[in-house]
Amino acid sequence: TKALDELIPNWKNEGAPVKTKVSKEKFLFLGKNSSLSWPTWLLPSVQKNHKNYIISLANLCRWLAEQAEKLGVEIFPGFPASEVLYNDDGSVKGVATLDMGLDKDGNKKDTYQEGMELHAKVTVFSEGCRGHLGKQLIKQFNLDEGKNPQQYGIGLKEIWEVSEEQHQKGLVMHTAGWPLDSKTYGGSFIYHAENRQIYLGYVIGLDYQNPYLSPFDEFQRFKTHPSIRKMFEGGKRISFGARALIEGGIQSLPKMYMPGALLIGCDAGTLN
């Protein structure tokens, strides 16, 4: 919580949704019907979660938005940035939001609302993986010159509600191995959060060689493993989703600044 401590020192008193401390960690290497527990002290530091918290990022972002609005920050949910605006000297001037209230042919409806121009001394782009404006900026300013090609993965996630007996609040668990073969990058995360909820996810690199591989089907197969299935039997899946992930690492990281703008987060490639 170092960054949160610096940003909002009294975040605990302000009701931040950061409550479930990591209490136990596991790393399993799975065979088809077996599992090998890997000693956590052998794991790299990025895989160690001592003193970390299990959170819902969506809940934290909503709370941070409330704190920002208290300081006078204006937030425009539902208004996507559609275009980068430039000054005469080529520097970034800001963005324009999308026109709203158009029919499928682009004609104006009664609810038409023209997009807004938002100008700033520095515009920060944080659109996530392969952001459509971020891609334009990387090309426009040649930010990836001399860098390795970027690599991508897909992450599938579910939230489950399980019984008290199956729930181990504070447990962080990762797995590698089955159902993927040795040539395919991927693995899982299983986080036991509050309210008897488990955040379950599976990530597969999109450079897999088998054209018949289905990331979704591999995720479902993973849940049938004896070491995994027992956590969810009798439980209920309450939400699910998927997203693209940046996997290229530091050797693929573009320059993150340009005249009048910054790239941050997965728009630049700084996963974790």
Where are the regions a protein language model picked out?
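N-terminal FAD cofactor-binding segment of flavoenzymes
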Residues: T1-S34
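Domain-scale detector for complete catalytic domains at protein termini or as standalone homologs
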Residues: N13, K104-K109, K236, A244-L245
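A short catalytic or substrate-binding loop motif that flags glycine-/basic-rich loops and adjacent residues
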Residues: K19-K21, P179-T184, A244-L245
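Short glycine-rich loop/turn motifs
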Residues: K24, Y185-S188, M258-G260
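Helix-loop-beta segment of a Rossmann-like dinucleotide-binding subdomain
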Residues: L36-L57, E66, G94, V203-G205
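Flexible, glycine/charged-enriched surface loops at secondary-structure junctions
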Residues: K230-G241
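FAD-binding beta-loop-beta segment adjacent to the flavin cofactor pocket
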Residues: A242-L271
